[in-house]
């Protein structure tokens, strides 16, 4: 065998490979698929660029496992239907969050006294007054046991209290004052009887004789 035989055989192999991998042609933006051709991601149904039609159609690039191949519809994303569902999803999200908020157990929330209901069944706490407020109310009560509406408003603004608080304080103070004076009046007759007891004098002794 001559050397020309080996050269020709080697050259024939390269030519066969060249047909399998053709030289890429210069591509342009016009040869790329447009948006209508790329409607589905990974679908593989759109046309290929003009530069590589024979490359992907070669038997080397065929799926060696036809039993495990996926149809184009299995991974095809319909963008149009997804875009139509976006408003529906956005409308359902606030409702879902609101429903989840109402269904949360009360143990996750801390209830403060001011958050409780103010209905008739509510147990009212005892109103506390500062030392300054108590002193001013006592001074006013010393001069006036009953307040007019105008005076009550003035005191409420001066002490940063409500008219209802002023009214209740004076009612309680009058009850306390009456109770104290009633106790004093109950004790006073006993002392008066002792002081008004009859005493024997020298003239009475003479009359008895």
Swiss-Prot record:
Composition bias, Polar residues: 26-38
Motif window: Antp-type hexapeptide: 111-116
Cross-referenced InterPro entries: Antp_homeobox (IPR050296), HD (IPR001356), HD_metazoa (IPR020479), Homeobox_antennapedia (IPR017995), Homeobox_Antennapedia_CS (IPR001827), Homeobox_CS (IPR017970), Homeodomain-like_sf (IPR009057)
BP term (GO), one: anterior/posterior pattern specification
DNA-binding region: 122-181
Subcellular location per the Swiss-Prot or TrEMBL entry: Nucleus
Molecular-function GO term, any one: DNA-binding transcription factor activity, RNA polymerase II-specific
Region (Disordered): 25-44, 179-209
GO cellular component: nucleus
Keyword terms of this UniProt record: Developmental protein, DNA-binding, Homeobox, Nucleus, Transcription, Transcription regulation
Induction: By derriere.
Pfam family, one: Homeodomain
Subcellular location, principal: nucleus
SMART domains given in the database record: HOX
Role according to the record: Sequence-specific transcription factor which is part of a developmental regulatory system that provides cells with specific positional identities on the anterior-posterior axis.
Protein family (similarity comment): Belongs to the Antp homeobox family.
Protein name: Homeobox protein Hox-A7
Gene: hoxa7
């Amino acid at each position: 065998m001559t050397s020309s035989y080996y050269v020709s055989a080697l050259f024939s192999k390269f030519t066969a490979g060249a047909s399998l991998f053709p030289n890429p042609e210069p591509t342009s933006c016009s040869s790329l698929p447009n948006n209508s051709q790329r409607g589905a991601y990974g679908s593989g149904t759109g046309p290929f660029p003009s530069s590589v039609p024979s490359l992907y159609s070669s038997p080397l690039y065929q799926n060696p496992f036809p039993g495990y191949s996926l149809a184009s519809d299995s991974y095809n994303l319909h963008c149009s239907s997804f875009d139509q569902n976006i408003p529906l999803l956005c409308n359902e999200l606030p409702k879902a969050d609101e429903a989840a908020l109402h269904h949360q157990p009360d143990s996750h929330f801390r209830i403060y006294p001011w958050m409780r209901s103010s209905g008739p069944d509510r147990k009212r706490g005892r109103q506390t007054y500062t030392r300054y407020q108590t002193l001013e109310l006592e001074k006013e009560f010393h001069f006036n046991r009953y307040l007019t509406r105008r005076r009550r408003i003035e005191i409420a603004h001066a002490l940063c209290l409500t008219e209802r608080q002023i009214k209740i304080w004076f009612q309680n103070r009058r009850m306390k004052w009456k109770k104290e004076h009633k106790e004093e009046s109950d004790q006073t007759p006993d002392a008066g009887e002792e002081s008004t007891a009859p005493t024997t004098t020298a003239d009475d002794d003479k009359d008895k004789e």
